Amino acid sequence: MLIRFSTVALAAGTLVSGLSPSDIPSDTPISSLLTSAQNHLSRGETIDALVYYDAAVARDPNDYLTLFKRATTYLSLGRTAQATEDFNRVLSIKPGFEGAHAQLGRIKARGGDWEEAKKQYHMAMKPEDAKALEVAKGAAKLAEAAAKTGNWEECASQADEAIKVAVRSLPLRELRARCRFESGYAAGGIADLQHVLQMKAGDTSPHVKISAIQFYALSELENGLGSIRKCLHSDPDSKVCRKLLNQEKAIDKALQRIARNLENKQFTIASRQLIPTGEGDGLIKEVKEQVKILREDGTIPSSLPNSLVSRLVSMACEAFHEVGYIIHFCRGCSPTDIMYSQKT
């Protein structure tokens, strides 16, 4: 006879496991189940270990040590909600169990729930963890204060300290992303937004911001296109994501045509594709207008560079030079405002 379990956690765990709960004979001693779980853990087979822990818990739901081991296994898989539930079950069976309080304290601390984490650490008799928690809490407050005064580097620095403890705090990640962007640290801000995406399932706005910054501010066209495609993968019906993807694809295609013309020494054609002529406004103006909109709505922070426009201007300078034009950059105006006159 075989045991078949139907709990949600078990079903989820076995989706990527080579082991099925039906593979475990019903008369397997609990001690053997626990030994098998430990053996799988030692080999890094965490999902398979979880199947054995599930079987052991189903056989004896009041064994708090087995529940605790399953909870730590859940935690190693990033299943915080299930781990929290098991740790709370442990405490309902064994009140005051310090190991469960300590783990709950760490879970709460990682999420930036300072007061609940402090409470759990107190019950776990973990004064050093409680001390580190207070330091992180203080740093978080200093980061918020620095942001209010526009001291972006101080904000990012204090947020660094807080996030060492509160690694899964959504407000802190969003705050540090903002402060990093405002201080000109684009890569760091993008890294934080990628964490935000993991914590805010279904929210496409970080995808849009990441893509626009990569594509326009940093001139990382492939990365920008890849990020906005992830947005549509997350929400295929998103009009905002679709609009930005179409916009970026059109620019990328136009830029590739210009690059080919320059490579083939068709400099006149390339220059006409870049600047306003009777045939159109040119790619530089088109991109500048798109960037203006993205900066005005806050998608691209004003502190970040204009690398794509600068790249296009450089291409225009190359084309103009080759066809015999003198390039003028007027003092006090934008370096993207190109003026030119024919050589005599």
Which sequence ranges carry the predicted segments?
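Alpha-helical segment of the N-proximal tetratricopeptide repeat
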Residues: 28-59, 138-165, 256-280, 315, ...
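Residue-level recognition of tetratricopeptide repeat
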Residues: 29, 63, 97, 114, ...
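Register position in tetratricopeptide repeats
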Residues: 42, 76, 110, 145-149, ...
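Canonical positions in the second alpha-helix
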Residues: 56, 89-90, 123-124, 161-162, ...
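Structural marker of alpha-solenoid helical repeat scaffolds
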Residues: 59, 93, 127, 165, ...
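Canonical tetratricopeptide repeat
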Residues: 69, 103, 135, 141, ...
